[in-house]
Amino acid sequence: RLTDFRNMKTNPASSIGFQMTTEQENEIDDYSWRLDRPKLWDRAIRHFAIDEGADLVVVHHPHIIQGLEVYNGKLIAHSLGNFIFDLNYPETYPSMILNSKADESGFTEFMIDPIYIDDYLTVPAKGELGNQILNHIANLSNDLDTYVHVDKDYNKAYVIMDTSSM
């Protein structure tokens, strides 16, 4: 039983200031209204977590899918979507379960199962609906320079961690 939390490691990003600099004199800000894409500062802080030693970064707060990104050989799930909340917005209905395999060397494989919020219940997304959700995840991930292979026969998708041989 844990009784003293003072000695537990905390996320280094939560205990230090963070500043992003560019090589140009102009400041770059992302004021995009699109919630289906991670903001520049979100990506930067998640990259920082990987740079500081995280093997996997998983985000769940935006309640909508934001895609997957392979960064320095590690996976960032920018947002898995929604799982339980009863938000009544259609864009919060599709979601995913991220599965992984690991061995002593670390994570070796990531698979995606599509899910859907149907009348406030989380259910597996099968058939055409499942493939639409997986294709959406693949498209969002492609925008983050990450390839997600969709297996339409089994309603599953696989993150390709190493694309050097493609």
Task: Briefly describe each language-model feature range.
Residues 97-166:
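A short C-terminal boundary segment appended to hydrolase-like catalytic domains
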Residues 2-5, 29-32, 62-65, 82-85, ...:
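Solvent-exposed loop/turn segments at secondary-structure junctions
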Residues 22, 43, 90, 127, ...:
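Electropositive phosphate-/nucleotide-binding environments in soluble metabolic enzymes
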Residues 1-12, 23-53:
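Active-site-proximal segments of metal-dependent phosphoesterases and phosphodiesterases across multiple
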Residues 37-97:
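Conserved beta-sheet core of the metallophosphoesterase superfamily
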Residues 1, 77-80, 111:
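Active-site-proximal beta-strand elements of phosphoester/diester hydrolases
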Residues 16-19:
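Long, Pro/Ser/Thr-rich low-complexity/intrinsically disordered regulatory tracts in eukaryotic proteins
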